[in-house]
Amino acid sequence: MIINIGELARVSDKSRSKAAGKLVEVVSIQLKHGVKDEDSEVKVRIIPKDGKSKPQFGYVRAKFLESAFLKAVPAKGIETIDTSHVGVDFKWKLGQAIKFIAPCEFNFIKDDGRVVYTRAMCGYITDQWVEDGVKLYNVVFLGTYKVIPESWIKHYSNALYA
């Protein structure tokens, strides 16, 4: 990642700095002859979560800085639509129980505390919207939720299974 003084960045959890995992502002960059740019020492100001705390500073290697703003990109095989017109018709209705199948396993915690891995799940649609041309649905199941694209939904489900 190319960084400039004054930019916002996130420090990777892999860093051993006290700024690891935090949002920071780049204060200065120390470049030395013979040292790779990625190994340059960067002074950062840790941005406090409450916005009021006294500023703290830390030092990290440039290779541990990540973009603070992530851009979602639709995965291959996900259908996209043209959103230039007003009003989008969603195939699956709000409040309905549906069954979806994810392309890879995800986990959820059962009532007894066990972690279970699955690809298929039933749940209720609680929200729907279009983002970057992809129709997305918020599906609630077993006390948690998952945002899924329309192509994962297979059919309406019996409410007993949701």
Curated annotation (Swiss-Prot):
It holds the Pfam family motB. One of its GO terms (molecular function) is double-stranded DNA binding. Keywords: Transcription, Transcription regulation. Monomer. Homodimer. Compacts the host nucleoid. Probably dysregulates hundreds of host genes including derepression of most of the H-NS regulon. Plays a role in the transcriptional regulation of middle promoters. This is Transcription regulatory protein motB. The lineage of its organism: Viruses, Duplodnaviria, Heunggongvirae, Uroviricota, Caudoviricetes. The gene is motB.
